[in-house]
């Protein structure tokens, strides 16, 4: 069994997928199993550069499992499929538009194993915002002790933590850290690059709710992370060492929006998986 399974959903973004796989192939942790679920119009796995990167991952001690699956039933179904294929204790959900510096997976694994929390994220920076400094959005709450369970309700003051993940705010705050120092900070939710404790994720139902969402939706990781934080806590690392390709989203409908949000299911999911936190405000 690999140290970590990297779960990678992709759809019609060959250029950014190549960027993502390049980061995967350079990780200091090499005992990895990459599971790709491709729902592109044409299979991306047949591209020569993609095949070369797959061979590189394998040559360094990893393995790659590729699935071409059409038609698409939405991103949450993709995540559910990938989770059902996973066997490692730790699973990294990695979007197909994120580049990781070589140390990222190692640091995420170290943090998850130390904290024994539900998840640890590494939020990517869009470097087109590198010169767009927004001090009013750079409020950060660090975990100075162990990561603990917490309730972060939509609309609460803690929900505003998401502002740190706008533009390049996290990148700018990270510049104040001494070289080589990492900090854990509190989140409302985190997207794009998240290492989960697989057993804990399954204990809150994973992404099995996919059939209740319309084809074009969002918020599936917001939902599961909210449940995980209530029971075991969650955090993110700074610096993140991840960078966003800043390409067009593939989870939106033709109007450029979504037809539903998974967070609408939060009240009943809390009742089912974290009932002891229902009354916490």
Question: Which sequence ranges carry the predicted segments?
Answer:
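Glycine-rich, basic loop-to-helix element that forms the pyrophosphate-binding segment
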Residues: 69-86
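Short aromatic/hydrophobic "clamp" motif used to bind/position activated sugar donors
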Residues: 91
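The conserved acidic donor/metal-binding loop of glycosyltransferases
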Residues: 95-99
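Short, well-formed alpha-helical segments that are part of the catalytic scaffolds
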Residues: 13-26
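C-terminal catalytic/acceptor-binding lobe
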Residues: 19, 182-199, 203-281
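A recurrent flexible, glycine/aromatic-enriched loop bordering the glycosyltransferase active site
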Residues: 152-169, 175-196
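Conserved donor NDP-sugar-binding/catalytic core segment of glycosyltransferases
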Residues: 103-162
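Acidic donor-binding segment of Leloir-type glycosyltransferases
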Residues: 25-67
